[in-house]
Amino acid sequence: FHCMTIDVPMFLDGEIKYVKFFEDDGIALREYFDFPVLGRVLLYPYPHPEQVTIPRHISCRQVTNKGSVLPERYYNLIRDMCRLGLAGLEPVNVKGTEVVPQDFSSAFIIRERDRILRETDFGDQRGCVSVVVRGKKGGQFREYRFHMASRSQALGEGTGIPAAIGAILLLEDKVEGTGVMPPEACINPGYLIELVSQVMPIDEKKEDGKSFGGIIVEEVDEKGEIKKLEI
């Protein structure tokens, strides 16, 4: 609910702007994206630090963050309850009983989750984190996509493995600067990619055989043709 009710920062046209999830400026940022493992998913504007920190360290015109929760029916339930005003914190009187709308909504959503997972035959957790970089190279349009996909976890591996790699780089004295910094300010991405090949063999030892999918890199040319790159 928090992500849908606060003003969402986005770096648009070279400056920080704040959009609202349910209003025209937020709706305009919704888009479908084809993920490895997940397939086509409708994404929504999502508040995150990258929109604020990346433009401070990398010259660019636009930085957005978008996301969703699977299965989509589950996310749609959360979205619709928030849109109906059931995310409020002020108690309301329901037949003589004081009820906090958000407390009711949270309990209802948790109750419905198992039913939705069962009816959609969702199966194991899965997830993907993707970074898309667009611009011009040699005067021609280029798009690069970096994906971290998992068939056995949601955001666990997409969050945990990069953080673990960051800790390794810190121990190896490959983190530049001091203090609190975002990754783009202190880590050479090449170091991270080098370590992925060391992490993946360890992850392959999972008993269920569903290992971390590693980093997938794709290039999209001016014709929209997608080519997978070896790293």
Show which residues each predicted segment covers.
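C-terminal catalytic/substrate-binding lobe primarily of soluble NAD(P)-dependent oxidoreductases
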Residues: 1-231
